[in-house]
Amino acid sequence: MASLRKSHPLLKIANHILVDLPAPSNISAWWNFGSLLGLCLATQILTGLFLAMHYTSDIATAFSSVMHICRDVNYGWLIRNMHANGASFFFICIYLHIGRGLYYGSYLYKETWNVGVALFLLTMMTAFVGYVLPWGQMSFWGATVITNLMSAVPYVGNDLVQWIWGGFSVDNATLTRFFAFHFLFPFVIAALTAIHLLFLHETGSNNPAGLNSDADKVTFHPYFSYKDLLGFATLMVTLTSLALFSPNLLGDPDNFTPANPLVTPPHIKPEWYFLFAYAILRSIPNKLGGVLALLSSILILTAVPALHASKQRSTTFRPITQLLFWTLVAAVLVLTWIGGMPVEHPFIIIGQIASLLYFMLFLTLIPAAALAENKALEWN
Protein backbone atom coordinates (compact mmCIF):
# COMPACT_ATOMS: atom_id res chain seq x y z
CA MET A 1 0.00 0.00 0.00
CA ALA A 2 1.28 3.48 -0.92
CA SER A 3 2.22 5.87 1.90
CA LEU A 4 -0.19 8.67 2.82
CA ARG A 5 1.91 11.34 1.12
CA LYS A 6 1.54 9.46 -2.18
CA SER A 7 -2.18 8.64 -1.89
CA HIS A 8 -3.81 11.62 -0.12
CA PRO A 9 -5.26 14.08 -2.72
CA LEU A 10 -3.61 17.16 -1.16
CA LEU A 11 -0.41 15.62 0.17
CA LYS A 12 0.11 14.00 -3.24
CA ILE A 13 0.46 17.45 -4.85
CA ALA A 14 2.90 18.61 -2.14
CA ASN A 15 4.81 15.34 -2.57
CA HIS A 16 5.23 15.93 -6.31
CA ILE A 17 6.51 19.47 -5.68
CA LEU A 18 8.67 19.09 -2.56
CA VAL A 19 9.59 15.43 -2.03
CA ASP A 20 9.62 13.14 -5.06
CA LEU A 21 10.29 15.86 -7.64
CA PRO A 22 13.05 14.64 -10.02
CA ALA A 23 15.80 17.29 -10.05
CA PRO A 24 19.09 17.40 -12.02
CA SER A 25 21.92 16.13 -9.80
CA ASN A 26 24.31 18.93 -10.82
CA ILE A 27 22.30 22.10 -10.11
CA SER A 28 24.36 24.62 -8.14
CA ALA A 29 23.52 27.17 -5.44
CA TRP A 30 22.28 29.50 -8.22
CA TRP A 31 19.15 27.31 -8.28
CA ASN A 32 18.42 28.24 -4.63
CA PHE A 33 16.97 31.65 -5.43
CA GLY A 34 13.55 30.39 -6.54
CA SER A 35 12.86 28.91 -3.11
CA LEU A 36 14.46 31.96 -1.45
CA LEU A 37 11.96 34.15 -3.32
CA GLY A 38 9.19 31.95 -1.92
CA LEU A 39 10.62 32.54 1.57
CA CYS A 40 10.82 36.31 0.92
CA LEU A 41 7.19 36.35 -0.26
CA ALA A 42 6.02 34.43 2.83
CA THR A 43 8.01 36.77 5.12
CA GLN A 44 6.63 39.87 3.39
CA ILE A 45 3.01 38.64 3.56
CA LEU A 46 3.38 37.73 7.24
CA THR A 47 5.10 40.96 8.36
CA GLY A 48 2.80 42.99 6.08
CA LEU A 49 -0.28 41.44 7.65
CA PHE A 50 0.82 42.49 11.14
CA LEU A 51 1.69 46.00 9.89
CA ALA A 52 -1.74 46.31 8.23
CA MET A 53 -3.38 45.62 11.61
CA HIS A 54 -1.95 48.89 12.96
CA TYR A 55 -1.60 51.07 9.84
CA THR A 56 -4.19 53.66 8.78
CA SER A 57 -4.43 54.65 5.12
CA ASP A 58 -5.41 58.28 5.65
CA ILE A 59 -3.10 61.20 4.85
CA ALA A 60 -3.76 62.79 8.25
CA THR A 61 -2.72 59.71 10.22
CA ALA A 62 -0.58 57.45 7.92
CA PHE A 63 2.79 58.89 8.98
CA SER A 64 1.75 58.91 12.66
CA SER A 65 0.49 55.32 12.45
CA VAL A 66 3.91 54.16 11.18
CA MET A 67 5.54 56.03 14.10
CA HIS A 68 3.01 54.41 16.45
CA ILE A 69 3.93 50.95 15.05
CA CYS A 70 7.62 51.59 15.73
CA ARG A 71 7.17 53.10 19.19
CA ASP A 72 4.11 51.54 20.82
CA VAL A 73 3.38 48.17 19.19
CA ASN A 74 5.20 45.16 20.68
CA TYR A 75 8.15 44.49 18.38
CA GLY A 76 6.54 46.85 15.84
CA TRP A 77 9.94 48.37 15.05
CA LEU A 78 11.25 44.89 14.20
CA ILE A 79 8.24 43.97 12.03
CA ARG A 80 8.51 47.27 10.16
CA ASN A 81 12.29 46.96 9.65
CA MET A 82 11.97 43.33 8.51
CA HIS A 83 9.25 44.33 6.03
CA ALA A 84 11.12 47.36 4.61
CA ASN A 85 14.44 45.52 4.29
CA GLY A 86 12.68 42.32 3.21
CA ALA A 87 11.69 44.19 0.04
CA SER A 88 15.37 44.88 -0.70
CA PHE A 89 16.25 41.22 -0.21
CA PHE A 90 13.29 40.23 -2.39
CA PHE A 91 14.76 42.28 -5.25
CA ILE A 92 18.32 41.05 -4.64
CA CYS A 93 17.00 37.49 -5.00
CA ILE A 94 14.93 38.43 -8.08
CA TYR A 95 17.92 40.00 -9.87
CA LEU A 96 20.14 37.00 -9.05
CA HIS A 97 17.35 34.63 -10.16
CA ILE A 98 16.91 36.49 -13.49
CA GLY A 99 20.70 36.66 -13.93
CA ARG A 100 20.91 32.89 -13.41
CA GLY A 101 18.15 32.40 -16.01
CA LEU A 102 20.00 34.56 -18.54
CA TYR A 103 23.40 32.94 -17.91
CA TYR A 104 22.28 29.32 -18.08
CA GLY A 105 19.62 29.69 -20.81
CA SER A 106 16.66 28.87 -18.53
CA TYR A 107 14.63 31.39 -20.59
CA LEU A 108 14.16 28.69 -23.25
CA TYR A 109 11.36 27.36 -21.02
CA LYS A 110 9.27 30.14 -22.55
CA GLU A 111 6.06 29.77 -20.50
CA THR A 112 7.95 29.66 -17.19
CA TRP A 113 10.09 32.63 -18.28
CA ASN A 114 7.15 34.81 -19.38
CA VAL A 115 5.20 34.12 -16.19
CA GLY A 116 8.41 35.06 -14.36
CA VAL A 117 8.59 38.41 -16.20
CA ALA A 118 4.92 39.03 -15.26
CA LEU A 119 5.83 38.22 -11.63
CA PHE A 120 8.74 40.66 -11.81
CA LEU A 121 6.48 43.47 -13.11
CA LEU A 122 3.85 42.75 -10.46
CA THR A 123 6.50 42.74 -7.71
CA MET A 124 7.79 46.11 -8.96
CA MET A 125 4.25 47.52 -8.86
CA THR A 126 3.71 46.14 -5.35
CA ALA A 127 6.98 47.66 -4.10
CA PHE A 128 6.12 51.02 -5.68
CA VAL A 129 2.64 51.32 -4.10
CA GLY A 130 4.10 50.06 -0.80
CA TYR A 131 6.75 52.79 -0.78
CA VAL A 132 3.98 55.42 -0.88
CA LEU A 133 2.24 54.13 2.28
CA PRO A 134 4.42 55.69 5.06
CA TRP A 135 3.48 59.09 3.51
CA GLY A 136 6.91 60.64 3.94
CA GLN A 137 8.40 63.22 1.54
CA MET A 138 9.92 60.65 -0.82
CA SER A 139 6.71 58.58 -0.69
CA PHE A 140 4.62 61.54 -1.82
CA TRP A 141 6.99 62.93 -4.45
CA GLY A 142 7.90 59.49 -5.76
CA ALA A 143 4.20 58.75 -6.25
CA THR A 144 3.69 62.14 -7.95
CA VAL A 145 6.62 61.77 -10.36
CA ILE A 146 6.07 58.11 -11.33
CA THR A 147 2.27 58.33 -11.76
CA ASN A 148 2.80 61.52 -13.79
CA LEU A 149 4.68 59.44 -16.38
CA MET A 150 1.28 58.13 -17.48
CA SER A 151 0.53 61.60 -18.85
CA ALA A 152 2.98 60.78 -21.68
CA VAL A 153 0.37 58.39 -23.12
CA PRO A 154 -1.05 60.18 -26.19
CA TYR A 155 -4.62 61.55 -26.03
CA VAL A 156 -5.77 59.82 -22.80
CA GLY A 157 -2.65 60.54 -20.69
CA ASN A 158 -4.02 63.29 -18.41
CA ASP A 159 -7.32 61.48 -17.85
CA LEU A 160 -5.38 58.33 -17.00
CA VAL A 161 -3.26 60.15 -14.38
CA GLN A 162 -6.31 61.71 -12.73
CA TRP A 163 -8.05 58.34 -12.78
CA ILE A 164 -5.07 56.73 -10.96
CA TRP A 165 -4.91 59.63 -8.47
CA GLY A 166 -8.67 59.68 -7.83
CA GLY A 167 -8.55 63.47 -8.06
CA PHE A 168 -6.42 66.34 -9.37
CA SER A 169 -3.35 65.53 -7.27
CA VAL A 170 -1.84 62.75 -5.16
CA ASP A 171 -4.19 62.90 -2.18
CA ASN A 172 -6.21 60.81 0.28
CA ALA A 173 -7.94 58.80 -2.45
CA THR A 174 -4.52 57.88 -3.91
CA LEU A 175 -3.17 56.66 -0.57
CA THR A 176 -6.30 54.60 0.16
CA ARG A 177 -6.25 52.82 -3.21
CA PHE A 178 -2.49 52.26 -3.04
CA PHE A 179 -2.95 50.55 0.33
CA ALA A 180 -5.71 48.37 -1.16
CA PHE A 181 -3.43 47.43 -4.08
CA HIS A 182 -0.47 46.79 -1.79
CA PHE A 183 -2.58 44.41 0.28
CA LEU A 184 -4.00 42.60 -2.76
CA PHE A 185 -0.95 42.20 -5.06
CA PRO A 186 1.11 39.80 -2.88
CA PHE A 187 -1.73 37.27 -3.07
CA VAL A 188 -1.85 37.68 -6.86
CA ILE A 189 1.95 37.15 -6.84
CA ALA A 190 1.43 33.96 -4.79
CA ALA A 191 -1.13 32.69 -7.35
CA LEU A 192 1.20 33.53 -10.26
CA THR A 193 4.04 31.78 -8.43
CA ALA A 194 1.94 28.60 -8.39
CA ILE A 195 1.49 28.92 -12.19
CA HIS A 196 5.25 29.62 -12.55
CA LEU A 197 5.97 26.36 -10.69
CA LEU A 198 3.33 24.47 -12.65
CA PHE A 199 5.02 25.38 -15.95
CA LEU A 200 8.48 24.63 -14.51
CA HIS A 201 7.43 21.16 -13.38
CA GLU A 202 6.06 20.40 -16.86
CA THR A 203 9.62 20.54 -18.22
CA GLY A 204 11.80 20.00 -15.15
CA SER A 205 14.72 22.20 -14.12
CA ASN A 206 17.54 23.29 -16.41
CA ASN A 207 21.12 22.69 -15.19
CA PRO A 208 24.54 24.44 -15.40
CA ALA A 209 25.66 22.44 -18.45
CA GLY A 210 22.45 23.30 -20.33
CA LEU A 211 22.14 19.64 -21.36
CA ASN A 212 19.31 17.12 -20.99
CA SER A 213 19.62 15.59 -17.52
CA ASP A 214 16.81 13.00 -17.69
CA ALA A 215 19.36 10.18 -17.34
CA ASP A 216 20.73 11.62 -14.09
CA LYS A 217 17.98 12.86 -11.78
CA VAL A 218 17.76 12.76 -7.97
CA THR A 219 14.78 13.34 -5.67
CA PHE A 220 14.28 16.89 -4.42
CA HIS A 221 14.13 15.63 -0.82
CA PRO A 222 16.52 15.16 0.94
CA TYR A 223 19.17 16.49 -1.48
CA PHE A 224 17.83 19.93 -2.42
CA SER A 225 15.48 20.45 0.53
CA TYR A 226 18.55 20.53 2.80
CA LYS A 227 20.54 22.53 0.27
CA ASP A 228 17.71 25.11 0.24
CA LEU A 229 17.67 25.22 4.06
CA LEU A 230 21.25 26.51 4.01
CA GLY A 231 20.09 29.34 1.71
CA PHE A 232 17.10 30.02 4.00
CA ALA A 233 19.39 30.30 7.04
CA THR A 234 21.83 32.60 5.19
CA LEU A 235 19.02 34.86 3.95
CA MET A 236 17.26 35.12 7.31
CA VAL A 237 20.49 35.76 9.26
CA THR A 238 21.51 38.50 6.77
CA LEU A 239 18.02 40.05 6.74
CA THR A 240 17.65 40.08 10.54
CA SER A 241 21.20 41.44 10.94
CA LEU A 242 20.37 44.32 8.60
CA ALA A 243 16.98 44.93 10.26
CA LEU A 244 18.54 44.94 13.75
CA PHE A 245 21.88 46.70 13.22
CA SER A 246 21.39 49.00 10.22
CA PRO A 247 17.67 49.20 9.40
CA ASN A 248 17.85 52.55 7.55
CA LEU A 249 20.94 51.81 5.47
CA LEU A 250 18.98 51.27 2.24
CA GLY A 251 16.22 53.83 2.92
CA ASP A 252 16.02 57.54 2.10
CA PRO A 253 16.43 60.10 4.92
CA ASP A 254 13.77 62.30 3.24
CA ASN A 255 11.13 59.72 4.14
CA PHE A 256 11.50 60.62 7.83
CA THR A 257 9.89 63.97 6.99
CA PRO A 258 6.07 63.89 6.68
CA ALA A 259 4.77 64.47 3.13
CA ASN A 260 4.50 68.14 2.19
CA PRO A 261 3.08 69.02 -1.26
CA LEU A 262 4.58 72.55 -0.97
CA VAL A 263 8.23 71.48 -0.53
CA THR A 264 10.01 69.45 -3.20
CA PRO A 265 12.99 67.33 -2.03
CA PRO A 266 16.31 68.30 -3.72
CA HIS A 267 16.68 64.88 -5.41
CA ILE A 268 13.63 62.74 -6.10
CA LYS A 269 14.70 59.13 -6.52
CA PRO A 270 13.09 55.71 -6.00
CA GLU A 271 14.40 52.88 -3.81
CA TRP A 272 17.79 51.44 -4.89
CA TYR A 273 16.25 48.44 -6.69
CA PHE A 274 14.50 50.70 -9.25
CA LEU A 275 17.47 53.00 -9.89
CA PHE A 276 18.69 51.19 -13.05
CA ALA A 277 15.27 51.62 -14.72
CA TYR A 278 15.03 55.21 -13.42
CA ALA A 279 18.45 56.00 -14.95
CA ILE A 280 17.26 54.65 -18.33
CA LEU A 281 14.11 56.80 -18.03
CA ARG A 282 16.19 59.93 -17.33
CA SER A 283 18.70 59.19 -20.11
CA ILE A 284 16.17 60.16 -22.79
CA PRO A 285 15.36 63.89 -22.98
CA ASN A 286 11.85 63.21 -24.35
CA LYS A 287 9.05 62.29 -21.90
CA LEU A 288 7.27 59.69 -24.05
CA GLY A 289 10.62 58.29 -25.24
CA GLY A 290 11.78 57.96 -21.63
CA VAL A 291 8.60 56.13 -20.59
CA LEU A 292 8.93 53.74 -23.56
CA ALA A 293 12.61 53.10 -22.69
CA LEU A 294 11.62 52.47 -19.05
CA LEU A 295 9.01 49.90 -20.12
CA SER A 296 11.37 48.36 -22.68
CA SER A 297 14.12 47.93 -20.07
CA ILE A 298 11.90 45.33 -18.34
CA LEU A 299 9.84 43.99 -21.26
CA ILE A 300 13.03 43.27 -23.26
CA LEU A 301 13.27 40.16 -21.06
CA THR A 302 10.27 38.70 -22.94
CA ALA A 303 12.25 39.00 -26.20
CA VAL A 304 15.30 37.10 -24.88
CA PRO A 305 14.05 33.59 -25.90
CA ALA A 306 13.39 34.83 -29.47
CA LEU A 307 16.89 36.38 -29.64
CA HIS A 308 18.64 33.14 -28.62
CA ALA A 309 20.83 32.30 -31.63
CA SER A 310 23.32 29.86 -30.12
CA LYS A 311 23.39 26.12 -30.73
CA GLN A 312 24.16 25.70 -27.04
CA ARG A 313 21.72 26.51 -24.28
CA SER A 314 23.98 27.63 -21.44
CA THR A 315 26.87 30.11 -21.60
CA THR A 316 29.05 27.67 -19.58
CA PHE A 317 31.05 26.76 -22.72
CA ARG A 318 30.70 30.13 -24.53
CA PRO A 319 33.50 32.50 -23.43
CA ILE A 320 32.52 35.45 -25.70
CA THR A 321 28.92 35.44 -24.46
CA GLN A 322 30.19 35.10 -20.88
CA LEU A 323 32.18 38.31 -21.30
CA LEU A 324 29.09 40.08 -22.71
CA PHE A 325 26.90 38.74 -19.88
CA TRP A 326 29.24 40.26 -17.27
CA THR A 327 29.32 43.47 -19.32
CA LEU A 328 25.51 43.50 -18.97
CA VAL A 329 25.84 43.05 -15.20
CA ALA A 330 28.34 45.95 -15.13
CA ALA A 331 25.97 48.13 -17.23
CA VAL A 332 23.11 47.49 -14.77
CA LEU A 333 25.37 48.35 -11.80
CA VAL A 334 26.52 51.57 -13.50
CA LEU A 335 22.87 52.47 -14.24
CA THR A 336 21.99 51.81 -10.57
CA TRP A 337 24.75 54.22 -9.50
CA ILE A 338 23.72 56.86 -12.08
CA GLY A 339 20.04 56.64 -11.03
CA GLY A 340 20.98 57.90 -7.58
CA MET A 341 23.09 60.80 -8.89
CA PRO A 342 21.91 64.34 -9.76
CA VAL A 343 21.11 65.14 -13.40
CA GLU A 344 24.34 66.94 -14.32
CA HIS A 345 27.60 66.40 -16.21
CA PRO A 346 29.21 63.80 -16.33
CA PHE A 347 26.38 61.61 -14.99
CA ILE A 348 24.04 62.37 -17.91
CA ILE A 349 26.40 61.08 -20.61
CA ILE A 350 27.49 58.06 -18.50
CA GLY A 351 23.82 57.13 -18.04
CA GLN A 352 23.13 57.50 -21.77
CA ILE A 353 26.11 55.31 -22.75
CA ALA A 354 25.16 52.64 -20.15
CA SER A 355 21.51 52.70 -21.35
CA LEU A 356 22.58 52.28 -24.98
CA LEU A 357 24.94 49.45 -24.01
CA TYR A 358 22.16 47.75 -22.00
CA PHE A 359 19.83 47.57 -25.01
CA MET A 360 22.61 46.80 -27.51
CA LEU A 361 23.77 43.80 -25.47
CA PHE A 362 20.29 42.27 -25.49
CA LEU A 363 19.37 43.11 -29.09
CA THR A 364 22.60 42.87 -31.09
CA LEU A 365 25.84 42.03 -29.26
CA ILE A 366 24.83 38.80 -27.49
CA PRO A 367 22.97 37.34 -30.54
CA ALA A 368 25.96 38.31 -32.77
CA ALA A 369 28.38 36.62 -30.34
CA ALA A 370 26.19 33.49 -30.40
CA LEU A 371 26.38 33.37 -34.21
CA ALA A 372 30.17 33.85 -34.09
CA GLU A 373 30.47 30.99 -31.58
CA ASN A 374 28.32 28.77 -33.82
CA LYS A 375 30.73 29.51 -36.69
CA ALA A 376 33.73 28.69 -34.49
CA LEU A 377 32.18 25.32 -33.61
CA GLU A 378 31.88 24.47 -37.31
CA TRP A 379 35.65 24.96 -37.82
CA ASN A 380 36.31 21.90 -35.69
UniProtKB/Swiss-Prot annotation:
The regions listed as transmembrane in this protein's record are 33-53, 77-98, 113-133, 178-198, 226-246, 288-308, 320-340, 347-367
Question: Keyword Electron transport: yes or no?
Answer: yes
An annotated Gene Ontology molecular function:
ubiquinol-cytochrome-c reductase activity
Pfam families for this protein: Cytochrom_B_C (PF00032), Cytochrome_B (PF00033)
Q: What Gene Ontology cellular-component terms does the record carry? A: mitochondrial inner membrane; respiratory chain complex III
Is Membrane tagged as a keyword?
A: yes
Q: Where is the signal peptide?
A: none
Q: Cofactors per UniProt?
A: heme b
- Top-level division of the source organism's lineage: Eukaryota
Enumerate the residues binding heme b b562. H83, H182
* InterPro entries from the UniProt entry: Cyt_b/b6_C, Cyt_b/b6_C_sf, Cyt_b/b6_N, Cytb/b6-like_sf, Cytochrome_b, Cytochrome_b_C_euk/bac, Cytochrome_b_N_euk/bac, Di-haem_cyt_TM
User: What's the protein's topology in the membrane?
Assistant: Multi-pass membrane protein
Which is a GO BP term held by this UniProt record? mitochondrial electron transport, ubiquinol to cytochrome c
- Residues that bind heme b b566: H97, H196
Could you say which protein family the record assigns here?
Belongs to the cytochrome b family.
Task: Summarize the subunit comment.
Answer: The cytochrome bc1 complex contains 3 respiratory subunits (MT-CYB, CYC1 and UQCRFS1), 2 core proteins (UQCRC1 and UQCRC2) and probably 6 low-molecular weight proteins.
Instruction: Summarize the protein's role.
Output: Component of the ubiquinol-cytochrome c reductase complex (complex III or cytochrome b-c1 complex) that is part of the mitochondrial respiratory chain. The b-c1 complex mediates electron transfer from ubiquinol to cytochrome c. Contributes to the generation of a proton gradient across the mitochondrial membrane that is then used for ATP synthesis.
Its protein name is Cytochrome b
